Amino acid sequence: MKFVVSLTFRLNGSVAENEAAAGRVLDVYSKWTPPAGMTIHQLVSRADGAGGFAVVETDNAADLIDTTSKFAPFADYEIYPVVDIADGVRVSQEAIAFRESIK
């Protein structure tokens, strides 16, 4: 199953605290590897530097917890299950046809 993960850095401290946290998260990231069962299709940073997005695929929700918990002190997460657009369009068309069949 595919997921879009949105992360927003927790910039709630003083400038010095935020700078220290930025260095720490980079140290942690440099040692991190994705869980074996998770494929990262895309990992991008926001242009404003305040977070990023990932498109990941896994059949095990624990892979998401494994990753987000390692970075939880530094970021807030929102995780959305997603489908490829062709599948989403097909299902939407089927839903419309279903509703139209009811008189």
What are these regions (language model features)?
Residues 1-50, 84-85, 89-103:
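Short S/T/G/P-rich N-terminal loop/turn motif that feeds into the first structured element of a domain
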Residues 8, 55-57:
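Short hydrophobic/aromatic beta-strand micro-patches
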Residues 32, 36, 58-91:
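An amphipathic, aromatic/His-enriched active-site/gating alpha helix that lines ligand/cofactor pockets
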Residues 51-53, 76:
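A common structural microfeature
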